[in-house]
């Protein structure tokens, strides 16, 4: 991650690119962008952003979604793919959290001013949802 290490990596990539592609194509390349893998903290922040988007949709019904750190770790264990980066996180949250909250709304298990807390049921090794009627809309 040091500037010298990054520059050395960039040069190695350019060498491979030059050996693989024709000069006509190389003339069209302006630069090579190098990415580093996302860290654990950054992935947690991405989950927070996804949950914030879901909360934006739930706000009109005066419902708040809270995801515990343990549940976030569970999401990362089940959804993160080093090859795909953070992309699978959104789909996983939609499939396993947002869909369950939607079912709860349709079953009228979430009255207005409710908080849905997502945690991990350790004995079953899956997500659990608890409802508390305490959220006050602003």
From Swiss-Prot:
Positions in coiled-coil regions: none
InterPro entries: Clp_ATPase_C (IPR019489), ClpA_ClpB (IPR050130), P-loop_NTPase (IPR027417)
Xref: SUPFAM superfamilies: P-loop containing nucleoside triphosphate hydrolases
GO molecular function: ATP binding; ATP hydrolysis activity
Keyword annotations from UniProtKB, A to Z: ATP-binding, Chaperone, Nucleotide-binding, Repeat
Pfam families: ClpB_D2-small (PF10431)
GO CC aspect terms: cytoplasm
Top-rank taxon, per record: Eukaryota
Gene Ontology terms describing biological process: cellular response to heat
Similarity field: Belongs to the ClpA/ClpB family.
Descriptive protein name: Heat shock protein 100
Originating gene: HSP100
